[in-house]
C-alpha cells in the first residue's frame, strides 16, 4: 500500500506549447549596394579603374605591342601609362580620400567624382586610338583630370584653413604640369627631352609618396604599438619639399649640381625620418 499510494502530489505535465520555444536571433537585412555610397569617396571608383587599367595595359604591352600605333605609342605610351595613367591616378584618389580626413571636407564626391572618372577614362581610350584628334582629346581630358583634383583639394584646404596641407594641391598641379610637358614633347619626337620630362614627373610622384609616408607610417605605427610616440616630421617635410622642387628644376634646366643637391638633401631627410620613426620598436 505504501508503494501504491503516494501522498506527494504529482505536478501536471505542461503541454508542449507552454514550454519556452527557442527563437532564431533577428538578422538585420543586408544593406543593398548604393551608387551614392560608391561615389562618396574617390578611391572607390578610381582604385578599381586604375587596377583594371593596369591589367589591360600590361597585357597590351606584353602580348600585343603591335597594336600600340597611336600618336602616343611604343615606349612613350608605356612610360606615360605607368606613371600618369596608373600611379598618379592612384595617388590622386588617395589624396582626395585622405584629404577628407585631413580637412574635414570631402574634396571630391558625387557629380565631380563622376566627371573625374569620365575624364580619366577618355584619356585612357584616346591614347590608344590611331588618330591625331584622339590624342589631343585624351591629352585635354587627362590634364583637366589633374587640374580638377588640384582645384578640389585647394578648395578643401582653404575652406578648412588647413595650412599643413597647402602644398598638396600644388603637388597635384605640378604632376599635371609635368604630364603636359611630356605629352607635348611626345609629339616633337625628342626622346631625350621626353625622358627628361618623365623624370620630372617621376620625382614629383616620389615627393607625393614621401608626403603620404610621413602621414601614414607614424599613424599606423602608433596605433599598432601601445605607448609609441613618433614625431610628425612637419618641419623636415617642408625642407624635403623644397629640396625636391630644386631637384625638379635642376632636371628641367639641365643643371646637374642642383639635381645632386636637391635629391641628396631629400634622401638624407628621408633617412632621418625613418630613424626617428623607430623601425625596431
Question: Model regions: which residues?
Answer:
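Hydrophobic alpha-helical transmembrane segments of multi-pass integral membrane proteins
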Residues: 2-281
Amino acid at each position: 500500500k505504501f508503494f501504491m499510494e503516494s501522498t506527494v502530489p504529482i505536478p501536471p505535465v505542461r503541454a508542449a506549447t507552454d514550454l519556452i520555444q527557442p527563437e532564431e536571433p533577428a538578422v538585420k537585412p543586408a544593406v543593398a549596394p548604393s551608387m551614392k555610397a560608391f561615389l562618396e569617396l574617390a578611391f572607390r571608383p578610381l582604385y578599381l579603374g586604375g587596377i583594371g587599367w593596369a591589367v589591360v595595359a600590361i597585357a597590351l604591352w606584353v602580348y600585343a605591342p603591335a597594336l600600340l600605333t597611336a600618336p602616343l605609342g611604343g615606349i612613350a605610351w608605356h612610360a606615360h601609362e605607368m606613371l600618369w595613367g596608373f600611379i598618379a591616378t592612384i595617388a590622386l584618389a588617395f589624396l582626395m580620400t585622405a584629404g577628407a580626413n585631413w580637412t574635414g571636407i570631402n574634396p571630391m564626391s558625387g557629380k565631380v567624382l563622376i566627371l573625374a572618372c569620365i575624364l580619366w577614362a577618355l584619356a585612357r581610350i584616346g591614347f590608344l586610338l590611331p588618330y591625331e584628334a584622339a590624342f589631343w582629346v585624351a591629352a585635354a581630358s587627362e590634364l583637366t583630370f589633374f587640374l580638377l583634383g588640384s582645384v578640389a583639394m585647394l578648395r578643401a584646404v582653404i575652406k578648412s584653413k588647413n595650412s599643413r596641407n597647402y602644398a598638396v594641391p600644388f603637388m597635384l598641379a605640378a604632376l599635371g604640369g609635368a604630364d603636359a610637358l611630356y605629352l607635348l614633347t611626345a609629339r616633337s619626337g625628342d626622346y631625350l627631352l621626353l625622358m627628361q620630362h618623365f623624370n620630372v614627373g617621376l620625382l614629383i610622384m616620389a615627393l607625393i609618396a614621401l608626403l603620404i609616408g610621413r602621414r601614414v607610417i607614424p599613424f599606423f605605427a602608433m596605433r599598432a604599438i601601445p605607448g609609441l610616440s613618433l614625431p610628425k616630421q612637419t618641419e623636415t617635410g617642408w625642407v624635403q619639399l623644397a629640396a625636391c622642387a630644386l631637384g625638379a628644376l635642376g632636371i628641367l634646366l639641365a643643371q646637374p649640381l642642383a639635381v645632386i643637391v636637391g635629391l641628396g638633401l631629400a634622401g638624407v631627410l628621408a633617412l632621418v625620418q625613418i630613424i626617428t620613426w623607430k623601425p625596431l620598436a
